[in-house]
Amino acid sequence: VTGFDTVLNPVIQLKLKQAAEAGAKVVLINPAEYEQHFEFASKIVYVKNDLSFLKEVAKGLLDLGKTSKAEGFDEVAASLASVKAGEDAKEIAALYGNAKKAMIVFQQNFVTTEAAALIADIAVVSGHIGTPRDGILMVKAKNNSQGLIDLGIRAGAEAMQGVKALLVFGEDPEADLSGLEFLMVSDTHMTETAKKADVVIPGTSFASTEGTYTNTERRLQPVRQAVNEEVSFSNWEIAAELAHMFEVEMPYDDTYDISVEMDDQLYKYKYAEVGEIFGGVLAPEKAELKAVGDAKFADPMASTDHLMNVIAERLPKPV
């Protein structure tokens, strides 16, 4: 476990504790300013908030004779030539590298992109990648994050270039939107972003949602409506109505119709059963290692979900 804050994903920490109780050896590597209650771990190492220790672990794997045919391996090995692995790093490299099955768990919006790249290098060089219980578990920030990726929504900031109109659903980003000619916001509260909007459409929260979420391990989790929010449209109905105005038909009567289309369009979901893991093991399509320079280990990203932030503020903080 490397780059982890329990407050962000308490259920994952519980799963790790259960794994330790079942006999798994759990090792925590975290920046010193982010100490965690991991009493169940076999080993805990708190390090500087940089990549030096992870590089020591990577060098420790090379010293064990680990290698890879992946593109970029020679460059990574050369970048680690002057690194000397300390005793803690050697111990962790040996434990991880020699294990029959091993997983690395880290939080997507907690570690830096450079740290994530180095973690991927470590996994590929060790050979622990792409088979059941043998790879990387990148813990997402939100309950719908994995589902969005599966639906093909992967565009980055470059997608905003030249955009003049924006439809924002459930997000409250700290961004300069002054260059837009039109802004629509759909949210549960009058957020700062909503105050700048030309049109605001009341949205519904998770508490009044019907359907499923796809969690980090690709397990379909059903949700049932618990609260009746007095709004004209549910979230999916807002999208369908907007599409209709642009003469794009979304012929759905309910969430079941959406599920049927997902089954038809997305192979991973075709035979997925609620509560079961599906498509959880993905081997790299083309493993490409990347030499990483100096960077921070952790640099947590602020959430752009207003309701999530409100709830987080009211939760009791660990002592």
What is each model feature region?
Residues 1-273, 319:
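Non-catalytic alpha/beta scaffold blocks inside enzyme catalytic domains
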Residues 115-120, 255-319:
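Long, low-complexity segments enriched in small/aliphatic residues
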